[in-house]
Structures are given as C-alpha cells and as structure tokens.
Amino acid sequence: MAQHIKLTPDTLNPLRSINPMLISYNVETTEITGGTFWKAYTDAQIDGTEQVPPPDFSKGMGAMHQWYDPIDTTNPRLIKLAKELGSCWVRVSGTWATRTYYDFDGTGMPEGYFNHLRKQQWVNLCNFVKAVGGKLKISVANCDGLHSHDEPWNPSQAKLIFDLSRELGCPIEAVEFVNEPNMLQNTGFPKDYTAADFRRDQDIFHKWVRENYPECTIVGPSDTDPNAMSVDADGNPHPWAAGGDTAGIAAALAYCSTGDLMDGCTEKLDIFSYHYYNGVSERMAAMMPSAFTPFEGCMSEAYLGAAAHTARCFLSYRDKYAAPGGEMWVTESGDAGAGGHTWASTYAEVIRTLNEIGSFATVTDGVIFHNTLASSDYGWLKHGSFDPRPSYFAVLLWKKLMGNTVFDSGEAIRTGAHVFCHDRADGKAGKAYLVINNSWTDTTTVELPKEAEIYALTGNGGMRSRTMLLNGIELKLGEGDALPELNGVAAKGTIEVAPGGCTFIVL
C-alpha cells in the first residue's frame, strides 16, 4: 500500500547524541599481509542471471576462498576516498588476525601461525590511518604459534605491534582481544582451546593493556550469540524467526555464548561489542539455507528490521559486561557473512546500509564497523581498482547531511516508510531526514512543511545496478578521481520517493 508521510520537524523529541564516528570500517588483516579471502562473484552472478554453485565443502572453508595479494594502502585513490569519509575508526582484525605473526625484524614466520605481517606492511597501514584522520583498533594473535591451550597467553607478539604503532605516531587506541571467540574451533585458536581458556587469557590481556597502554580502550567480546539475538528485552522474537531461523549465521556458528565467554572474567570491558550480518551469502547458502535471504527479500521488513532488533537484544549484555547505558560497537557488520551477497556491490545494498545506520542510532549510541572498506563484494570500494560502489556514496551523503543528534521521527517503521531524523550535519538550524521506500511497487509521498533540499537516490537502471543516481545524475569519479558534486535540489509541497528509493530531505 502506498504511504503518505507528513514531516513535522518542530514537534520531534530528541533521543540521544551519537558518536560522530558512528560510520567506521574494517580492513581485514589478510588484506594487509596478502592471503586468502572470499572468492569473487562473476559479473553474471552479480547481475542475478547466473546461479552461484555450491562449493565443495569436503575441501573445507578454502573451497570458498581465493588468494589475494596485499592491498596497497599507499594508493592515492584509496587514501583520497577514505579521507572523504571523515574521521573513522579503522579496525584491522578478522579471523586471519588470530593466526598472524608480526615479523618486524625480518627473521621469518615460525610454525603455528598462518599469516605473515612484515614491518613495512604495518608502517604503510599506520601511515594510511594517519593520512585519512582515522583511529586504529586491532585484535591480536592467539594461536598455537604463541602458546598451547593449557598455557596462559603471553604478550610477546602483542607488545611488538603496540610499540611499533606508537613509535609510528599511530597508537592503537582501541583493542579487542581476539576476533569472534564464539568460534573456538577451526578458526585459528590453539588446539583444544575452551571458553575457560579464553576467559583466563582475556583477563591476562586486558590487565596487561591497562598496565602498559592505559590510554587504549578495551572492547569485547566481538562475538555472535544466537541466545542473545533470539528475543529482545521486550520479548519480541527475532524477525527471522518466522523463517525458521532465529539468528541466521550466529545460530549456525556460535559454539560459545556470550555468557560462556564473559561470566567469571575479572577485567571489565570499557565497551561491549558484537558482530552482526544479515545472514550468510550465496557462498554458504547450501550449508546454512535458513540463514540465507534471496534477493527478493532484500527489502523485506524481516531483513531490514533484524539489525535494530539485534542491537536491542544486546543492550542488557552491554549493561552487564561493560558500562551500563554506554556505547555498543558492532565491530563487524555487513549484508551477509562469507563475503556479501551477489548484490552487495550494487544499488540494492544501499537500502540495507542506510537503514542499519538509521535504525541502530535510534536504539543506542555507538559505532558500526562496516566489513569492509575495500575487499570482497561487500566492500564500499572495489578490491584492486578502489572504484567507489553505490554504498560508498550513500554513506558519504549520510556524513554530509545527517548530524549527531537523533530524533524520534514520529513515524512507525513500515513497508514504504522507514523514516529517520537527525539534526543537520552542517550545524545550521533545522533537521535532516532520510526516507527509505522499501516497497518494490508503490511510490511513497512526503508532505514537506516548507522548502527543502532533496537528495534522491535510485539505482541507475534497476536495483542491481553497479552505479547509483543522485537526483537523476550518475555518481562516479571524474578526472583525477574528483568526487561528483553531491548537491540537492530545491522542492516544496510534496515529493515522491520511488519504489526502492532512498531520499535525504534537509530542512
């Protein structure tokens, strides 16, 4: 049913002020070192005209991976486009970080590690973080090469990367002990590692950080947890429950709950963190069919509502394990685990991306670390060429227009009307709205209280378009990698938001 929205900006109640670094991103450790990551889709698979064949799971996770050379963090285009996003947290972590050896003296990598980080690679990464005005966050190694499960974790490797980063003028300002400790088997941890071993070692690590790098913020546990995600504090079931899966990827992969990992720890977290994806991509759909959403569901209420529901579910965990009422950080987020859906690099992903940012900010203060900046199909920039994808321009517009004070929009979330309201990012009096029309067929009408600037986003020829239109003009880089002008158009009276359209309205 077509929706009609009447904007009433002068009557809205503020909800909270949010972290100006709400929109941040991941650079996977395996990108820095070079290594395996998710296999790229074919052009036909991205277009939706070719099916993704199920991998041969008898070969393990490697059946879904391919080799990638190290990312060039000195690339001028990469630095320019990342800098345009403004100040962000840059998280260097991921599954591969747990088995990465910091070979800063050039002596080579011993047994028990998997990825090999050279000094110059880390120097380049730190220079990148400084060049883009970012803040550095990492997780550290915790594998057989460092210690066995019955031996306590030791800081011999962590000290190297903390000290080098500080020497380079790019201190590690936030840290998680390890990445996704809910999956203790077959992801890099010492053989036979248990939740009790994790609790022991996390306490050792956190105490060590506080004693030696007291300015560093301690974040954790960086996990997924189906128990936490199934029902929120008000008793509402997860939106995916109707489809037979209460927590998608988390339900299939979480071997330890948040309680298993945290109950009994003596070192309290500064900030509570978790990971969240909208299920799994086509790469893992055959293994986890109930966690996969087909393209036809990418604008459904269940699909779009899952991010805010998950944030509400974790509020009580934040209050228990970190600062009550404090920030929550989603230290990995994206459209789908296992590298993103086939449509992750297209306009269709803009709807989910903007909806997640808007809805998360209505639930809590915090930071969302998008996975990734420039790797795999869910990257904001295309791997290798660093061409900006539609979602890059979408988050760039959010940062340009939406301020850090969040208001209750006064509009119930419903098909055709996902409405979010903030103050203006330019500091001028007024409000900035985002209206997402997640209907496939019906146009949404918006009644304006006065003249406004309109920034209407649509696909360039369809939802799976590789490029996006702003007020009918294609967004792409110009000569010398110049950004396109991101200008609004004046409107008054009423405007229409096309099916699948996302429109920013600045009053």
Model regions and ranges:
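Intrinsic low-complexity, intrinsically disordered segments enriched in polar/basic residues
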Residues: 284, 347-348
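Core active-site phosphate/anionic-ligand binding loop and the adjoining beta-turn-alpha structural block
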Residues: 272
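Glycoside hydrolase catalytic-domain groove-lining segments
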Residues: 117, 277-337
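Histidine-centered active-site/metal-ligand motif
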Residues: 180, 275-277
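Non-catalytic accessory regions flanking glycosidase/transglycosidase catalytic cores in CAZymes
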Residues: 1-177, 181-255, 262-268, 319-331, ...
